[in-house]
Amino acid sequence: HGDSFEVCKSCVDNGFSSVMIDGSHLPYEENVALTKKVVEYAHQFDVTVEGELGVLAGIEDDVVAEKSTYTKPEEVEDFVKKTGVDSLAISIGTSHGAFKFKLKDGEEAPPLRFDILEEIEKRIPGFPIVLHGASSVVQDYVTLINQYGGKMEGAVGVSEEQLRRAAKSAVCKINI
């Protein structure tokens, strides 16, 4: 998971068979340009590239986002065509980080936006889709951790039901 050409190039040069370039924090055209540059370099060495459209809230590998921005289905076809990526990470309501969603009593985690996923699948049928930040948080473990002094009150993740539904779609990889 890299946020620069240099990081991805270093991974390719050091023998990685795939890289993930996260330009989602950039304006659309800059994301396209950065992702395309990584793809052009990586493909010379038969290295696959995952790109990302839409911003996931949270922190991952020093990429910080305060709030999530859903992937715009109308951008995916253009992005895939212009960049040549091999797979595409999208934002449909997941989040990076250890705690996912912090809920108050009586609240439920927001559902994933399967309407966005379905629209993306229509626009790029059969194309490999990736969900980042899609881990689940087993409530029995949260209770046990809190019982022994941990502080994970209200921590939940993506429900197993939603993960199963995503896995039945074009989602080929779910990162936790």
Positions of PLM-derived features:
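Alpha/beta enzyme core
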Residues: 2-128, 139-156, 160-169
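Short catalytic/ligand-gating loop segments at beta-alpha or beta-beta junctions
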Residues: 131-136
